[in-house]
Amino acid sequence: MDHDKLEANLLDHALTKYLKSTKQLDEATVPKHVNNVRGFILRIIYRHGSCTIKDILKEVTLSPSATTTALNHLEQEGFIERSRNNNDRRTVWITLSESGRGAAEQMIENRQQLIDGMFERLTAEEKKTFLAIIAKLAQ
């Protein structure tokens, strides 16, 4: 196995382990009908406070129709609320309801617990280096 494949496999393994762990935590602490996609959308809305579907589409890899379907489910389940912009009726603002905010906060807390657990094994210098690398990759 060449060097690049080893690195790719290592990164893939780490990401898979992280995603599996977050899924298990979410399944134990978040309402069952909030799947990964809907949870991701809830966390996007949480970060924005209030946003439009265009704002969400900038951050997801879903089609506009799949995003709208997920938002429809979240609205039916009482996790989000939609309201029209009084100045431009074409613009629909999306905000979290109380239950949506609670679910998003729980998912964020779940991820923070996992990251805290992972970072316990690292020195301060290793954490700093790791975060610098992640920031560079995310650019």
UniProtKB/Swiss-Prot annotation:
Give start and end residues of each DNA-binding region: 53-76
Cite the entry's keywords alphabetically: DNA-binding, Transcription, Transcription regulation
- Listed SMART domains: HTH_MARR
Looking up InterPro entries in the UniProt record yields: HTH_MarR-typ, MarR/SlyA-like, WH-like_DNA-bd_sf, WH_DNA-bd_sf
What is this protein's name?
A: Uncharacterized HTH-type transcriptional regulator YwhA
Among PANTHER family, the record links this protein to:
HTH-TYPE TRANSCRIPTIONAL REPRESSOR YETL, TRANSCRIPTIONAL REGULATOR, MARR FAMILY
Q: Which SUPFAM superfamilies did the record assign?
A: Winged helix' DNA-binding domain (SSF46785)
Sorted alphabetically, the Gene Ontology BP terms of this entry are: regulation of DNA-templated transcription; response to stress
Organism ancestry: Bacteria, Bacillati, Bacillota, Bacilli, Bacillales
Residue stretches making up the HTH marR-type domain: 8-139
Tell me the domain of life.
Answer: Bacteria
**Which GO terms of the molecular function aspect are on file?**
DNA binding; DNA-binding transcription factor activity
